[in-house]
Amino acid sequence: MRLVLDWDGTVTVADSMDLIVREFGDADLVDRYSDAFIDDSKPLPVTLQHVIETELATIKTPLDEVVAWLLEKVELRPGFLDLVERERPLLLSSNLRQLIEPVLAHYGVEADLIANELVADDSSGWRIQIDGEICPVCGERCKRQRLPAGEITYVGNGYSDRCPALASSRIFARCGLARYLDSIGAPYEPFGDFHQIAAALGRDA
């Protein structure tokens, strides 16, 4: 069974995309969209793709400066470095490859990665490329469409993890993803760090 991990808020303690938009872009926009995605009682006003594109377009700082700042701020969840050596998971993220790869390199991590692409970082604002077809289940260009074939153990925490998690055989969830799964009665295993996940996977090996 392939282990697939979300990045922001799952591997990282804090959402690194939110961090950089707050520092280099429009922090008020982050708050506005975060409130909308947290409130499960109301339909979402926009797609996740729109949120990502709009937030990142407010950043006008060159990528290398943002990466240098991020490497000083980002914190990885306890147990991740040990787990990634043992399992070599797939990292599946709505964030940008150009922001994730430097963090992995900084920590000496080798892992398979699927993420979105930054195509411009000039003074007119960052522009990105999100590939994939519209998902027939959720109606977005979601991460379900990029899951590998076969049985999946999925680990996630937020809105972008809902659809891929529900397509997986086993789910480890926290925060918003856990609340969503509770609301629809879907089974999952809660986690706080990757030591707990490693222990659960070890027991079932």
Where are these regions (language model features)?
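C-terminal cap/substrate-recognition subdomain and adjoining C-terminal extension
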Residues: 75, 79-91, 95-205
